[in-house]
Amino acid sequence: MVVLPLFVLAQQSPVEQVRKYVQTQEGNILKAYQQFLSIPNVASDMPNIERNAAWIAEQMRSLQMDKVQLLYPATKGVPPAVYGEVVTPGATQTLIFYAHYDGQPVDSTKWASGLHPFKPSLYTDALHKGGKPIAFEQTRYEPQWRIYGRGASDDKAGVMAILQAYAALKANGIMPKVNMKFFFEGEEEAGSDHLHEILEANQALLKGDLWVICDGPVHQSGQQQIVFGVRGDTHLEVTVFGPKRPLHSGHYGNWAPNPGMMLSKLLASMKDASGKVLVKGFYDDVTPLSAEEKKALAKVPSVDAALQKELGIARVENPSQSLAEAINQPSLNINGITVAGTGKYSANVIPIKAVASIDLRLVVGNDWKRQQDKVVKHIQSQGYFVTTNEPTDEERMRYPKIAMVIRSGGYNAQKTSMLHPLAQKVVQAVTTAQGKVVLTPTLGGSLPLFVFEQYLKTPPITVPIANHDNNQHAENENIRLKNLFEGIVTFASIMLLPR
């Protein structure tokens, strides 16, 4: 660790001191992060999930945080949240910092050659920009270098940035201006189905004035953004049935119904060519944007043309609206379709069934159960008998079109007023640290933030730090070093909110 002369430190602002600290500690920060990313973090893998939780708790204890503990839900066999706190003498306001340490399930065979989701690798740039692997131990680190690994951006980066922000303040003898509580969830990527149990059982412990969420990417323009809402989320799995056994497509083609064709037509009936969802009543419950939100949207930098070029998209679904406008509407997306084999596994058959996974994103006003109901009614309107089980022989002979619909859990969207006084202080602090900040009414992604208001009566806002091209939820997930290091600075600035 480099010790700076006291007269130099005295001339620097607290944020500048933090930035300098991060620069001198980059190697140590990355060494710790490499250890963290090496622990598998799929929510269903409880032994490794608990290893992650124990690692975080140990980091918090090393920072001398108070009341460090694991908060388990009432339901057994479910990931814990990791909690700790720092009480600041004389502080009158309490911020609760949130990130999640679990990650999406992985298929390591889909990752690029040389990469493994739980063997983090350092590259000189993004893979698509020609990045090459290098050792973690370096004498200096360039801002465009990237770490590849599951959770590198979503959302172990959030955990690391928050912890290192406090470490930087502590190392420089800088006192936070607010009371701070830290809450790191372990079930977010599995739907946070039991988060409410933890919140309900620990209402006094989790009392605060504002939740500050670290999850998601910065704006596609590269600017820091602060987000005042998130979309809700729920899923449906739809299975359409054909013959009871696979049939030879030559012997039975033009005669036996093909479930792949049936499912394709059913899915196509749900959206028109402009991307509008045709499910009856899909948009009826949407709460209109406020005047303040419309004003903020008008100031969001336009990135559509650049993104189309980056992603190789000639035409977006609805050219009349921007991406910023589109994510403020509910959506229906097909996550995946399974019918029969393709490529070397292709066979001349009429398959027995076809399955689609449907993702519904919600905005304020939508109820996730009602939104599911609307889709099910649409399926029925297309002539399908809807069941929740495999069809019986009697049902197969009675109904020509059968769809089995399995509903997942879900959660509603959430918004905090863009005029909230404490949120405005966060905006001022981050703007001072990072310059121009994009203010966004809603994040395109989803987080179960409505439960914080429902059970704790405390509003949340989101301060993302990951690069927009981080491949979260997919193979080759990564974090750009500049985003990680500046994320530490950003969260340190929030911890220094004026009283």
Q: Where are the regions a protein language model picked out?
A:
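Metal-dependent amide/peptide-bond hydrolase catalytic core
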Residues: Q11-S13, H235-E237, F241-N478, K482-E486
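Acidic/histidine-rich catalytic neighborhood of metal-dependent amide-processing enzymes
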Residues: T139-G229
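Bacterial Sec-dependent N-terminal signal peptides
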Residues: M1-S13
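Solvent-exposed loop/turn segments at secondary-structure junctions
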Residues: F36, V42-S44, T75-G77, G90-A91, ...
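Active-site metal-coordination/substrate-binding segment of hydrolases
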Residues: T92-K181, E486
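N-terminal hydrophobic or amphipathic helices/low-complexity stretches enriched
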Residues: A10-I49, I56, R61-L63, T109-A112, ...
